[in-house]
Amino acid sequence: MKGIFWNSRGLRDLAKFRFLSDLSKEKNLDFIALLETGRKNFIDTELNNICGGKNFLWSWIDPKGRSGGILLGINPSVFCIGFISQGDYHIKIRMRNKVDGFQWNLIAVYGAAQAEHKKSF
């Protein structure tokens, strides 16, 4: 099992999509957690490119203002999904490895950048 956590500092330019696609193919990634995406939505072709054409399952949280945003994708051919939950600052996926049956939680967290939101984080 291989995966990455990456603070993308915005996910709009083609170079970042190419980097993620190449990395996903080269390292054969099974999960991708991107933080600070700055995006409210993604189209299927973008998601397909990020994971190098694999059939990933995706979940995301919108940014708060100009900062934040989380995108989390996993390969369902490697993991059985128990549940997906979202909070204001995290996405949590409960899953089980198909190979050995090990159960675990994958959690992507991105805290508030603005002082007025830090208390709720």
Regions inferred by a protein language model and the residue ranges of each:
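Short phosphate/oxyanion-binding micro-motifs
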Residues: M1-F121
